[in-house]
Amino acid sequence: MLQSRDGDVEAYNHLVSRWEKRVYNYLLRLVRDPEDSLDLSQDVFLKAYQSLRRLEDPARFSAWLFRIAHNEAFSLLRKRRPETELADQAPPSPPAAKMLPVETSLAVASALNRLSEDQREAVILKMYQGFKFEEIAGILECPVSTVKSRVYTALDLLKETLAPIETRGDA
C-alpha cells in the first residue's frame, strides 16, 4: 500500500488485483448491471490511484476504497433513478414445492432488491464484504448506531421475506 502511495504502478496493480473482485461484486449488488459495475470499477480504481497520496491512514485503505465505490455507485443511481423505479417493482416470487440453490440465490437477490438502498448497502457491506460496523459507518458517513439499525432491520425484513422459502425447502 505504501509503495502504491509513493507512485509504484506495479504495487498499485497488485492492489487492484487484490480488490477488484470485491469492489466489482459490491457495485454489482448496488447497481444491478454487470456492464455498469465493470465501468464503475474502473472509475473507482482510477479515482483511487489519483487520490492515493491523500489517504492519511493506509490501514483504512479498504474502507476508503469502498467509500469511493459507494460515491460512484450512488452518483450513477441518482442519474438513472427514473428508469430504475419501475425495475425495482419485482413481481412476487412464484410458489415452488422445493427451491434449488440457483432459485434460492435468485430469491435472496430479489429480497435484497426489496430493501431500501440504505438497508441493502449496509447488508451488502456487512454480510457480503465482511466489514465491521465501524468501517461501514466510515464508508457510509453515518453513525455506527444507524448502521446497526439498518443492518438489523434489513435482516429482519429478509428473514420475513425468505421464511416461506425456507419452509417450502423443508417439505
What are these regions (language model features)?
Residues E10, A107-S110, R120-E121:
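Pre-recognition alpha-helix immediately N-terminal to the DNA-recognition helix
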Residues N25, D39-L46, Q50, A59-N71:
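Structural recognition of an alpha-helix C-terminal capping motif at a helix-to-coil junction
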Residues A122-K126:
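A short pre-motif secondary-structure segment
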Residues Q3, R32, E85, P101-V102, ...:
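C-terminal edge and immediately downstream basic/flexible tail or linker adjoining helix-turn-helix-like DNA-binding
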